Amino acid sequence: MKKIIFLFLCPFLVFCQTSFDGVESLFENKQYGKAEVFLSEFINKNPDNLKAIELLGDAYGHQKKWDKAIDVYELLVKADDNNANYHYKYGGVLGMKALENKLKAIGFIGDIKYSFEKAAELDKNHIDTRWALVELYMELPSFVGGSMKKSMKYAQELENLSKVDGYLAKGYIYEYDDEPELAEKYYKMAITEGGSLTCYDKLTKLYESENKPKEAIKNIESANKKHQRNALHYQIGKVAAEYNVELHKGEKCLHIYIKNYSAEDGVPKAWAYYRLAQIQTHRKYKAQALKYINLAITELPSIKLFKKQKVEILAL
């Protein structure tokens, strides 16, 4: 169920141009506490404004205040039982609450399934809720209703709505069911059909999980050829360093990453230095490895993994 987390949070932000549209900037800047205060005050004066109430639930969700979010979405479901998004969000926060308290999780499962299935019934085009159902039924144990057959049913519904989502969902199902060849087939179909970075990333992670680093690197190179993202240079270097393969290519890509680095790339340069240190450690080039690990530690001194790598280098 952990894989559902982003489905609960990503769809939260649905803004409207009203007297409280200033909340949009608070969400964009991740100032969820301020958004909560703003919306609470607004709702005190406008208690029947369902959009404001929904946004308050979203603010609670982003802050992982699951109990408060549950209360808000339950109120919305009671106010409008035919709103698919309300059911979807209610099921989502119940799921997150269940993840935090495994002892009570079984008690939430019935309501979670009902909420997602109700959302799917109300909105035949609701992609997110079908994704949630695919993952829910795969990850639940069979004795509480888990079912690959049901998961595949919703994957097929996804494919009818969006071939890419359907292929990714089927790839996920087969990967979870430990059928990597079928998972690879569907991830490749998703790449052919859509070719987004997400599609490539799913296949890359599958190859890594199957201990196929050379295939992973080849796939990342294909993604970079199409999307031309500097972050993909880091990914190539990471795989090369972790699996001790294609070290020259990995080193070259990491230097490109560092040279062209910007905050948008996501991974701090310190991690690229760490990967370079790993590569030089594989080669047993102690001086070069120390040079790069010291650069990594200087930039991010609190990372324990960097310090562990330095101990390994000093032992060369």
Feature-to-residue mapping (PLM):
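TPR alpha-solenoid repeat register
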Residues: 52, 86, 129, 166-168, ...
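Residue signature of alpha-solenoid helical repeat architecture, marking inter-repeat boundaries
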Residues: 47, 81, 88, 107, ...
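Structural motif corresponding to the intra-repeat A-B loop/turn of tetratricopeptide repeats
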Residues: 29, 63, 97, 140, ...
